[in-house]
A protein has these predicted regions:
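Short beta-strand segments
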Residues: 15-18, 66
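Conserved aromatic
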Residues: 19-23
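Short amphipathic alpha-helices within nucleic acid-binding modules
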Residues: 26-30
């Protein structure tokens, strides 16, 4: 079984679906990308959380966001 993750952000330019061999690899990729987004959005202030099969990060009151959806759940 492949573990697919869908990434989306407010720009719609870099949206993608990626496949991983294991659930652990997929979860590690989500964590790594989330950390990158935290660094990028640090100066704007951000909030983030897990909602069911999605992990999201956003700027409260702003347009910036990114999400990672676990498609195997």
């Amino acid at each position: 079984m492949k573990y697919k993750v869908r990434y989306e952000d407010n720009t719609s330019v870099n949206d993608w679906i990626d496949e991983y061999e294991t659930e652990e690899a997929a979860e590690n990729a989500i964590k790594e990308e989330l950390e990158n987004c935290k660094e990028y959005l640090q100066s704007l202030g951000y909030d983030y959380g897990d909602f069911g099969n999605k992990t999201e990060i956003w700027v409260p009151g702003g347009n910036e966001y990114a999400s990672w959806e676990r498609l195997w759940m």
